[in-house]
Amino acid sequence: MPARARPARRHKWVPLALCFALFALPLFVIHLPFLHLPFFWDELGQFIPTALDLFRHGAWIAHSTTPNVHPPGVEAYLVLWYELFGYSIAITRVAMLVLGSFGLLLTFLLAIRLSRGTPGAPAFLPPLLLLASPLFFTQSMMAQLDMPAMVFTLLALLLFLREQYAAAAAASVVLVLTKETGLVVPFVFFLALVAQRKWKRAGYFVAPAAALGLWLIVLHNGTGYWLGNPGFAHYNVGYALHPVHVAFSFVRRVYYLFIAEFRWIGLVALLLALRNRATRRVFHSPAWRVTIAVAAAQIVLVSVLGGAELERYLLPVLPLFYIAVSIALAAFRRRVSFAATAALVAGLVACLFWNPPYPFPYEDNLAMVDFVHLQQIAARFAERN
């Protein structure tokens, strides 16, 4: 390699590192009060015990909690941190926030790619909207699967749109070993390439299915069940496939993604902006067709499968919606765009503290912190009595 090429390649990483720091700094600052927050719900009941089984005993299949179909990708990532710095709540939170920072960076890079032909600099808005979102705020520090799945979905999609198909397939392998439902993403890529008769490149995206299949074989050999345990299979497949459950789940997904937490402001802006020919042209691009297919496939999959209708399952789609909203807002006059953006950001931040007037998972906003503190009070009371 010529001597001049090596410094040039190194310099390409400098802007990315600066952007990563730009996004990581506010994310870490706003989470400083919560770095020692005790684990919550699925963290304590599933993912941390699984990670500790791997860390302390080298067991890829959990034995201190009930095993299930979820691949151990996130747990393996946490074990790397535990090997370097030791196990603690704070180290776990920091490890997840690092991944969340990459999620903000990838949202920005993907927004640049998808907003080509749009006036202004709309790519800066989606990371801001994601940072202000209550769901991302809580999930970015929690040892769960959906925020990491969001990160690798964005990475795989970005690489695919850049026509780096082998790298996109590799990112997809990591994605499905992070969360099994991520398989829908390389499946969309496979179909897109088959439609273009790019058979060899489409073949790359068989690798994620093979990786997930290998994990299922390991899980079956260790537990005797393809999904880890019969209760998990019944609740997340058998029960979930009831038509009433599917219909209700789909409505709930649509409501949360497009209306809840003042996202209806973005939806209205998007619908109005689509009346503009230039905006429609952006969304009719091949890149957006693939992106919309990925988002739609994710929404349908998490509506059909999964007994718990948790909003965190929509995390991989949320940045894509924010990118679409940012492009739509760029089509309006500056005052209108600024007012709508300010209202949307303010609404998202308010919903971090304000609980909706209907039942919701506490992990969707800061109610999870209140609940953890309540559990601490109850534990101290139980110890004294």
Report each predicted region and the residues it spans:
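Signature aromatic-anchored transmembrane alpha helix within multi-pass, membrane-resident enzymes
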Residues: L16-A21, V206-G213, V268-L272, T279-A296, ...
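Membrane-embedded, lumen/periplasm-facing catalytic core of multi-pass transferases
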Residues: F160, T341-N385
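Membrane-lumen/periplasm interface segments of specific transmembrane helices
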Residues: V29-I30, W199-A273, A297-L301, L305, ...
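Short helix- or helix-capping micro-motifs
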Residues: F23-L27, A123-P134, L158, S172-V176, ...
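Specific aromatic-rich, kink-prone transmembrane helix
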Residues: L104-L109, L129, P148-A167, A171, ...
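Transmembrane-helix motifs of polytopic, lipid-linked glycan transferases
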Residues: F20, V94-R116
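Perimembrane helix-loop-helix junctions
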Residues: R4, R9, L161-R162, V184-A210, ...
